[in-house]
Swiss-Prot record:
The UniProt record lists the keyword Nucleotide-binding: yes
Organism listed in the record: Legionella pneumophila (strain Corby)
InterPro entries linked: Anhydro_N_Ac-Mur_kinase (IPR005338), ATPase_NBD (IPR043129)
HAMAP family according to UniProt: AnhMurNAc_kinase
Family: Belongs to the anhydro-N-acetylmuramic acid kinase family.
A Pfam short name: AnmK
Coiled coil: none
Keywords assigned by UniProt, alphabetized: ATP-binding, Carbohydrate metabolism, Kinase, Nucleotide-binding, Transferase
Gene name in the database record: anmK
EC number in record: 2.7.1.170
Biological or metabolic pathway of the protein: Amino-sugar metabolism; 1,6-anhydro-N-acetylmuramate degradation; Cell wall biogenesis; peptidoglycan recycling
Reaction catalyzed: 1,6-anhydro-N-acetyl-beta-muramate + ATP + H2O = N-acetyl-D-muramate 6-phosphate + ADP + H(+)
Protein name according to UniProt: Anhydro-N-acetylmuramic acid kinase
Functional summary from the UniProt entry: Catalyzes the specific phosphorylation of 1,6-anhydro-N-acetylmuramic acid (anhMurNAc) with the simultaneous cleavage of the 1,6-anhydro ring, generating MurNAc-6-P. Is required for the utilization of anhMurNAc either imported from the medium or derived from its own cell wall murein, and thus plays a role in cell wall recycling.
Length: 366
């Protein structure tokens, strides 16, 4: 038995998920979510929205996020009463602030200094997972299908798994076939940004506000014409693409805020449903994870758009939808520490297998 910690803050930027994972059983021992401090969240919002930040302030933010990730580890270990020396390594995703693979020089950047995390926790850290995949010709995302493949390793039927974070991504798993996956488009990011702008709430709980509006079909049809939705897979995208500025250039003065929220939920539902329907007629089970798995109105829309396919939360398998990505980075850290390459060729389009991540070691004294 080996213990690893995974740290994840996704494109929703709703906090740091920390998960203690037992391997090789893939059992979640404990998980917590630590909210970002107001200053860090404000600086992250400014950075994502393209507001001016100096190079010095970005460097400081990298260290501050590292400190907050380390504090999440400290809180996790205190709650579960585990000593840092019992942990083999931490897998830290960091906080994505930019990700673009569309040009001749693709790039990705996750903040959260690995040296800071390892020094403050006394635990070896593996971070910067996505860069190696980009260098190997991949999209750098999504990685979730790798771990979904582990969970459904004994699958006897074709299933789809959709992780609905800020960006939604899909995994297709079938017996005796290579696992495939890619980014679909906006998951929660536009809905979260719109309700925050209009109501000051971080997210639309259960999709209640969206359910009070009416879908603006001309707007929905216009949004669905975005070129990203028509790219072939593998493909990936960042939250900075599907931003409020992307949305607002399509809005008209007579649109009500609630109707716009309903339309944004419909956009997420339609792009997910279209992806599932276009892929395979054999898919009969769709499992949801990520924050969107709690959005009742979104699940109802998906069920309506996907007749004959059972839509359920991955929680029905006894797996936490909230900590699945953090668990994945704990698992990825174990692969790196043990020099086990992973195969992302059918997911990100990478050329060949690779060992992901950079290691920030701590010399343990016993």
């Amino acid at each position: 038995m080996s213990l690893y910690i995974g740290l994840m803050s996704g494109t929703s930027m709703d906090g740091i998920d920390a998960a203690l994972l037992e391997l090789p059983s893939n059992q979640l021992i404990h998980g917590i979510t630590k909210q970002y401090s107001d200053d860090v969240r404000r600086n992250l919002d400014d950075l994502i929205m393209g507001n001016h930040l100096t190079l010095a302030s970005i460097c400081q933010l990298n260290t501050l996020i590292g400190r907050e990730f380390a504090e999440a580890v400290r809180q996790l270990l205190i709650e579960i009463k585990v000593h840092p020396k019992e942990i083999q390594a931490i897998g830290s995703h960091g906080q994505t602030v930019c990700h673009d693979t569309s040009g001749n020089i693709p790039y990705t950047l996750q903040l959260g200094c690995g040296h800071t995390i390892s020094s403050l926790t006394g635990i070896t850290v593996v971070a910067d997972f996505r860069t190696r995949d980009l260098v190997n010709g991949g999209q750098g995302a999504p990685f979730a299908p790798l771990y979904h493949q582990q969970i459904f390793s004994k699958v006897n039927e074709s299933v789809a798994v959709v992780n609905i974070g800020g960006i939604a991504n899909v995994t297709f798993i079938a017996k005796n076939q290579m696992t495939r996956g890619w980014d679909i488009g906006p998951g929660n990011c536009l809905m979260d940004a719109w309700i925050y702008k209009n109501k000051g709430a971080p997210f639309d709980k259960s999709g209640v506000w969206a359910s009070q509006g009416e879908v603006i079909h001309p707007l929905l049809e216009y949004l669905l014409q975005d070129p990203f939705f028509h790219l072939d897979s593998p493909k990936s995208i960042g939250k900075e693409y599907f931003s409020l500025s992307w949305l607002q250039k399509h809005l008209k003065p007579d649109y009500t805020p609630a109707d716009i929220q309903a339309t944004l939920l419909a956009l997420t539902a339609h792009t997910i449903a279209e992806t599932i329907l276009n892929e395979s007629e054999e898919i009969k089970q769709l499992y949801l994870c990520g924050g969107g798995a709690h959005n009742t109105h979104l699940k109802e829309n998906l069920a309506r758009l996907l007749p004959g396919i059972t839509v359920k939360s991955i929680a029905e398998l006894g797996i936490s939808p909230d900590y699945l990505e953090a668990m994945m980075f704990a698992w990825l850290a174990a692969q790196t520490i043990n020099q086990i390459p992973v195969n992302l060729t059918s997911i990100t389009g990478a050329k060949g297998i690779a060992i992901l991540g950079a290691v920030y070691p701590i010399i343990k004294s016993y």
